[in-house]
Amino acid sequence: MAFSGHHARKRFGQHWLKDESVLQRIVAAAALQPDDHVLEVGPGRGALTAQLLASPAASVQAVELDRDLVAGLQQRFAAEPRFQLQSGDVLALPQLGDGERRPTKVVANIPYNITGPLLERLVGRLDRPVEPPYQRLVLLVQQEVARRISARAGQSSFSALSVRMQLLAHCRSVCPVPPRCFQPPPKVQSEVISLDPLPADQRPPQAVAKQVEHLLRLAFSARRKMVRNTLASAAPAVGLEVWLADAGLTPQQRPQEIAAQQWVALAAALQPAL
C-alpha cells in the first residue's frame, strides 16, 4: 500500500478529507475545463487529487511538504501523466507548479495554521496582488476564516481580512464541512469557499490600494474605537472630519461598520494628506 503505516501529523496540520460528497462539491465548484492546469496544495494521501484527475483538467500540479507522503503520492499516481508533484513548503518555493504551464486554478484542503500566509501567496495583498491572478481558488478552510472573508460591514466577524479579500476577489461560500468528514476530525468547523480574483481594472488603483492597507492597519489595531481616534495620525485633525465626510463617513463610525468600497473612498479622500 502506498501510505501503509502513515498517520496524520499534527505539526503539519494534517486532517484528511474523506467525505466523497464534499470532495465532489469541491471539484464541481472549480468548474474545471480541458485547458485548466490545477494547483493542489497539500494533497495528503491523494483523495482530492484523484477527484481532480477524474475531471477534464489538463494537469494537476500538487505541492506536498510531508516527504513521507511524497513517495506514496508518486506511487499512487505513477500511471497518471497529468499528475506532477513538487516536494517542499508552499510558502517558500520560488515557483508554484510547472513553469511551462502556469496553474490557472487552485483547489486545496489547506493546513489551517498557514491560511493567512497562503492566501497572501495565492491572492496577494492590496498593494501587491498576484499577477496574473488565478482564475479561481476553491479552498477548504476553517469556518471562522470563511466567515471573516465573506462578512459584511456591521457584522461581528467583519475585519481587515474581509476588506482585503473583497477588494481582491469575488468571494462565496460553497458548503459547510463538519469535523466528521475528516480523518482525524479537527476540533473546529470547516467550510469550502470559492474566490474569483478580480482583474486589475476592477481593483483599486495601486496608489489607493497602498493607502487602504495603511488605513486598515491603523483602524483595525483598535477596532472598537471610532475612526476619528484611530485615524487621527493619518491626517491633520483639523481636516480629518472633512475628509471623512468626503468619503461618506462620520467620525463616530467604527472600522467594522465601514464597507470595503468605503475604505477605497476613504483612502482616495485621504491620499493627499498621507
Curated annotation (Swiss-Prot):
Catalyzed reactions: adenosine(1518)/adenosine(1519) in 16S rRNA + 4 S-adenosyl-L-methionine = N(6)-dimethyladenosine(1518)/N(6)-dimethyladenosine(1519) in 16S rRNA + 4 S-adenosyl-L-homocysteine + 4 H(+)
Keyword S-adenosyl-L-methionine: yes
InterPro entries: KsgA/Erm, rRNA_Ade_diMease-like_C, rRNA_Ade_Mease_Trfase_CS, rRNA_Ade_methylase_Trfase_N, rRNA_adenine_dimethylase, SAM-dependent_MTases_sf
Keywords, comma-separated and alphabetical: Cytoplasm, Methyltransferase, RNA-binding, rRNA processing, S-adenosyl-L-methionine, Transferase
One Gene Ontology cellular component: cytosol
CDD domains registered for this protein in UniProt: AdoMet_MTases
Annotated Pfam families: RrnaAD
Keyword Transcription: no
Family indicated by similarity: Belongs to the class I-like SAM-binding methyltransferase superfamily. rRNA adenine N(6)-methyltransferase family. RsmA subfamily.
Function recorded in the entry: Specifically dimethylates two adjacent adenosines (A1518 and A1519) in the loop of a conserved hairpin near the 3'-end of 16S rRNA in the 30S particle. May play a critical role in biogenesis of 30S subunits.
The name this protein goes by in its record: Ribosomal RNA small subunit methyltransferase A
Organism of derivation: Synechococcus sp. (strain RCC307)
Lineage, opening ranks: Bacteria, Bacillati, Cyanobacteriota, Cyanophyceae, Synechococcales
Protein encoded by which gene: rsmA
